[in-house]
């Protein structure tokens, strides 16, 4: 019989479990927060599939980096994945602007091509590529505490995976604050942005670069498929609660905490994979927001602003 109290305290019953699970929770929070902040602008631009495209598009970059270096060390993998992610984004933008293809068709064509190329390269036996496709797709956040320790100037500084994700999360937050107005205006009205002298193309590629960095940093923990859930669920859920984009952005932090803690306890209770449990928790939180949210919920009469409807009435600050 299910016991709620036992389910909640089982994950924290010993000192070792507390240390182990805190690392998993912090990793989940940073992944979800980073993906959610970027996802706010991706969803506003009606390009939710872009996260999925870049997530799949980084696979050939990872494999090629391994084939060239024979190592899965952080540096080569990040460089290869970022180049592949930017290449995927550039291909999508080129197809969208230079051909009659719609955005969804351009993204679908590009990410399937990149992902297929990655699978073909992964199947090659050159150098005995020790990459598990299941790990790339689904990740294993539960192994975060086993990551190598970061050593600087001979001093141990803690879990390297947490440091890597922490730096990316910090960069994402700083970029969101510094470039907020540019991202907002270019997301809702590119004509206005051009009339104000904003470099629309540079901002678009900058967002793709940030997206690629977040995806690369996250794929080992939650896998490329679940990155999309972490990227879409926070902004979409909070859009039913708030009418202003700054509030939607701020809500990403408490939602990330709920996803991470809720997913961990769900995994302990049902013996599910932790990363999938975090995504399920996100869906469970989304449902009441969608049904009863004050900003366009199914059972409310207020009109939904915002993140789904474009630029009507959205304040810039």
Predicted regions and their residues:
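Structural signature of hydrophobic alpha-helical transmembrane segments
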Residues: 19-32, 74-86, 165-170, 216-229
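Helix-loop-helix "hairpin" substructures at the membrane interface of multi-pass membrane proteins
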Residues: 157-229, 233-234
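Transmembrane alpha-helical segments in multi-pass inner-membrane proteins
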Residues: 217-276
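Cytosolic-side transmembrane-helix boundaries in multi-pass membrane proteins
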Residues: 275-317
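Transmembrane helix-bundle core of multi-pass membrane transporters
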Residues: 115-175
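Hydrophobic alpha-helical transmembrane segments
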Residues: 25-30, 78-83, 105-109, 162-167, ...
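Short loop segments and helix-boundary regions at transmembrane helix junctions
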Residues: 41-131, 238-250, 267-270
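Membrane-interfacial amphipathic/re-entrant helices at transmembrane-helix boundaries
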Residues: 1-34
């Amino acid at each position: 019989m299910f016991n709620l109290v036992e389910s909640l305290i089982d994950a924290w019953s010993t000192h070792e479990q507390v240390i182990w699970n805190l690392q998993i929770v912090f990793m989940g929070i940073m992944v979800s927060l980073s993906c959610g902040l970027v996802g706010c602008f991706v969803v506003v631009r009606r390009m939710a599939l872009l996260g999925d495209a870049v997530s799949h598009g980084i696979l050939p970059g990872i494999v090629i980096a391994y084939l060239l270096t024979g190592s899965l060390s952080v540096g080569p993998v990040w460089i290869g994945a970022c180049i592949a992610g930017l290449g995927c984004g550039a291909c999508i933008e080129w197809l969208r602007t230079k051909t009659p293809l719609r955005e969804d068709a351009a993204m679908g064509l590009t990410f399937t091509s990149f992902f297929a190329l990655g699978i073909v390269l992964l199947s090659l036996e050159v150098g005995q590529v020790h990459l598990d496709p299941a790990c790339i797709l689904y990740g294993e956040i539960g192994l975060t505490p086993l990551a190598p320790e970061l050593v600087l100037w001979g001093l141990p500084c803690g879990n390297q995976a947490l440091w890597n994700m922490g730096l990316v999360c910090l960069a994402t937050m700083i970029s969101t604050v510094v470039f907020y107005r540019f991202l907002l205006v270019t997301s809702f009205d590119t004509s206005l942005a051009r009339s104000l002298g904003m470099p629309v193309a540079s901002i678009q590629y900058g967002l793709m670069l940030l997206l690629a960095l977040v995806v690369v940093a996250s794929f080992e923990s939650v896998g490329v498929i679940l990155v999309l859930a972490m990227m879409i669920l926070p902004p979409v859920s909070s859009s039913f609660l708030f009418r202003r984009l700054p509030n939607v952005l701020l809500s990403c932090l408490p939602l990330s905490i709920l996803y991470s803690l809720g997913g961990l306890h769900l995994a302990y209770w049902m013996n599910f994979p932790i990363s999938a449990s975090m995504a399920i928790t996100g869906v469970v939180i989304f449902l009441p927001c969608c049904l009863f949210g004050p900003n366009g919920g199914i059972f409310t009469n207020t009109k939904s602003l915002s993140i789904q409807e474009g630029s009507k009435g959205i304040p810039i600050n």
